[in-house]
Regions:
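Extended alpha-helical interaction segments
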Residues: 1-114
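Alpha-helical bundle/repeat cores within regulatory domains of eukaryotic proteins
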Residues: 108-145
Length: 145
């Protein structure tokens, strides 16, 4: 692979990754915000601490049922108006892998097995990672400043 092909591949990777982030940021934020709003309601009903309740609900994210995962995935496709989300995820995985392969194998032609997650699985993984980060810093969602 010559240096121009690599540069083009790097540009494509950056663009696909930027597009994917742009598509996911607001819908994922809205999803986490809805978890916080549910925590507020639950905390009022049970007289528990809102942030502890928020953390409790966030900790359930990795264990979401397939129906919940698919519902969130479909919601994200609708609100982001991105019916090509699965293709975008695939493009990001392929571009990243091609760059890593070009660096690792130099001029050798070697077949690489690439497991690309489904769109729903990828979105659930993003939710899980975001939930972990917000669990560590729940004050980011407080409304009482």
């Amino acid at each position: 692979m010559d240096k121009y092909s690599r540069a083009l591949l790097v540009d494509a990777k950056q663009e696909y990754t930027r597009q994917l982030a742009t598509v996911l940021i607001n819908p994922i934020y809205d999803g986490i915000k809805s978890i916080y709003e549910a925590a507020e309601k639950l905390a009022v009903q049970t007289e528990l601490n809102i942030l502890k309740t928020f953390q409790l609900l966030l900790s359930k994210t990795p264990k979401w049922k397939p129906e919940k995962i698919n519902t969130e995935y479909e919601r994200i496709k609708v609100v982001s108006e991105c019916d090509y989300l699965e293709n975008l995820i695939t493009a990001v995985f392929v571009a990243h892998t091609k760059i890593l392969a070009a660096i690792r194998f130099k001029n050798q032609s070697q077949k690489i097995d690439l497991d690309i997650p489904t769109g729903a699985h990828f979105v659930h993984s993003v939710y899980t990672e975001c939930a972990r980060n917000f669990w560590k810093q729940p004050l980011l969602f407080t409304t009482n400043h």
